[in-house]
Amino acid sequence: MKKEVWRDVILSSVAFLALMWVAFFWAQKYFPMEQDTSAVAKVEEKKVAYLTFDDGPSKHTQEILDILEAYHVKATFFVTGSNPEYYDLIQKEDALGHAIGIHTFSHDYGKIYSSEKAYFEDVDKTNALIEKQTGHKVNILRFPGGTSNTVSRKYSSGIMSTLASAVTKKGYAYYDWNASNGDGNCYVGSDTLINTALKEIRDKKEVMILMHDG
């Protein structure tokens, strides 16, 4: 993704946060560092937004952390092992009070969705990385593509149902999303990203919004 486009993505995230906190007075909740799976709590008569970032850490993560810090906002980062030079940012995310979740080490659909064994080998590798950086393992995760993705069918029929059940039995809580700002498309500007986010959160009392830092 071109640097200037990523800058738009980051700025759109700032605008989104400002809109939530200033214009709508939303209450933002997040997963605590202890990774308590009961953290997704209802807040009566208030809208709740859970800000989540996938695919990092990367060269863009530090700027996102700076923005979140400026607005006193916490988020959840579902990390991968794709960029070893930025592993230290996992420790920084944790130290700043953000939550860390597993998004798989490789993010390789053909590999992780080929079998249950392959998926958990990748998950374990990611959790080992998180433990090395933060001193503790985590028990929250997000499947690449989400639980309803259809790409996985090419590699193993019914694998998502199998994995959703298996991760629960192993004590993990998995989280999809019900809104996105569309930043997976690197050819859209910040205005489009903001409008997409606002459209998707409309009429939702509890929002789990998907964004990317990698």
Predicted segments — roles?
Residues 28, 48, 96, 153, ...:
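Intrinsically disordered, low-complexity segments enriched in small/polar residues
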Residues 1-50, 66-75, 178, 191, ...:
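Terminal accessory/targeting
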Residues 85, 107-214:
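Catalytic domains of cell-wall/extracellular-matrix polysaccharide-remodeling enzymes
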Residues 30-140:
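Active-site beta->alpha N-cap acidic-glycine motif
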